[in-house]
């Protein structure tokens, strides 16, 4: 049946098929994401009647699905009819006005992102918090892989270092080294992650390509084995983990809810994104790009490969250490099984899907690969199937990623031109 409907949509004119497709997507979103939509509608006196119209206690009503289909189809139809006029009117505006309008939309989006969790409830706050942690780690790995070209499959080790140092410095348990506040423990955790990142990079300085992936994978596993070992158990608690880690507090107000911790993660992500953006445009960022493209040429140009690589590992680890620090206070406890290899793979996957070297791509990749599976927990067993399909689809349809950087777009375009020129040359030779 679905195949017949799909074939029918393809045969219909675009002006008809697009509203129908949009309506179906709108109705599907209303049903699949009801855990997100229902609390927002039900918690307000103004929107409560709309909630009762669309939903019942067991889910989306039939009339709700029809209403969502018609409303979404109408919006798509209206947009298709008016888009040329809107684009023409926008094009007639002077560049200054266009820039102000764009910044107005960006400001509105930021305000919605800030205010949305307050009304969405703790479940959505927890999902956004998880996405935020992966955004932080994604920005760190993006420095290593996307900009410097250093494939790191042991990245989760830095995440673990940040979490464990925070736990050891804050926990109210026999394993605590001190009883610091979060604001005292967090910078120390980040610094320790940087140190471990630099030490991590020393053995793999001369390793390239696939061998680098295997080497970093092994080093990451070494950290996990050390945490689980009997020798480190008196300090790190082994498999029992570190318990009773208190929540951070600001002026006597404890950040105890997922929404409050999300705002902490949001602030950390904004600061980290600014730092990463400035790094990318700096002399160090250009040196990273040079060694990514060709290490031998970069060295011939006078770039110190050792210093530049170690800085990439150390600064990338700082982002993971910050995420690990927040993760420790989010759970209130730390266990070794929380830091598995699959986390490194997830971070690498979201960078590939979002776009190598792109900060907005990291956010989009985390939203798609981390946020959507969290929202659709009834399909949780298919999470890794979804990851695989998403990566294959991106590689086939948008090899540069969903939101690539300008440099990556240029590289893809140049590669395509080179391949086309080579194909034309071969055709001429055969002729």
Regions found by a protein language model. Give the residues of each.
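Transmembrane alpha-helices and adjacent helix-loop boundaries
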Residues: 1-431
């Amino acid at each position: 049946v679905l195949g017949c409907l799909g074939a029918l949509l393809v045969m219909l004119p675009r002006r008809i098929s697009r509203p129908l497709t949009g309506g179906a997507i709108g109705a599907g979103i209303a049903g699949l994401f009801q855990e997100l939509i229902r609390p927002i509608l039900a918690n307000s006196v103004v929107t409560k009647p709309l909630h009762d119209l669309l939903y019942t206690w067991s889910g989306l009503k039939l009339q709700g699905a029809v209403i969502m289909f018609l409303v979404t189809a109408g919006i798509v139809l209206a947009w298709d009819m008016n888009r040329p006029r809107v684009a023409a009117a926008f094009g007639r505006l002077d560049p200054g006005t266009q820039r102000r309008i764009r910044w107005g939309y960006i400001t509105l989006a930021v305000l919605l992102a800030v205010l949305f969790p307050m009304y969405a409830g703790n479940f959505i706050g927890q999902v956004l918090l998880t996405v935020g942690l992966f955004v932080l780690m994604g920005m760190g790995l993006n420095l290593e892989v996307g900009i410097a070209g250093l494939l790191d499959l042991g990245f989760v080790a830095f995440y673990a270092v940040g979490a464990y140092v925070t736990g050891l410095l804050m926990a109210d348990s026999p394993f605590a080294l001190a009883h610091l506040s979060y604001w005292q423990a967090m910078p120390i955790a980040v610094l320790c992650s940087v140190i471990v990142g630099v030490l991590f990079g020393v053995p793999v300085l001369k390793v390239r390509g696939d061998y680098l992936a295997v080497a970093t994978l092994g080093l990451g596993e070494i950290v996990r084995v050390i945490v689980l070992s009997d020798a480190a158990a008196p300090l790190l608690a082994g498999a029992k983990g570190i318990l009773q880690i208190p929540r951070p507090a600001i002026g006597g107000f404890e950040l105890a809810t997922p929404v409050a911790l999300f705002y902490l993660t949001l602030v950390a992500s904004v600061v980290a994104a600014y730092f990463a953006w400035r790094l990318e445009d700096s002399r160090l960022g250009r040196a990273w790009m040079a060694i990514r493209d060709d290490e031998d040429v970069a060295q011939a140009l006078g770039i110190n490969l050792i210093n530049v690589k170690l800085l990439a590992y150390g600064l990338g680890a700082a982002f993971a250490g910050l995420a690990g620090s927040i993760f420790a206070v989010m759970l209130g406890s730390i266990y070794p099984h929380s830091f598995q290899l699959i986390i490194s793979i997830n971070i690498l996957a979201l960078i590939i899907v979002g776009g190598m070297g792109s900060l907005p791509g990291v956010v989009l990749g985390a939203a798609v690969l981390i946020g959507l599976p969290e929202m659709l927990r009834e399909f949780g067993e298919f999470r890794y199937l979804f990851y695989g399909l998403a990566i294959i689809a991106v590689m086939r349809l948008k090899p540069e990623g969903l939101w690539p950087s300008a440099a990556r777009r240029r590289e893809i375009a140049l590669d395509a031109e080179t391949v086309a020129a080579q194909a034309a040359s071969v055709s001429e030779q055969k002729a």
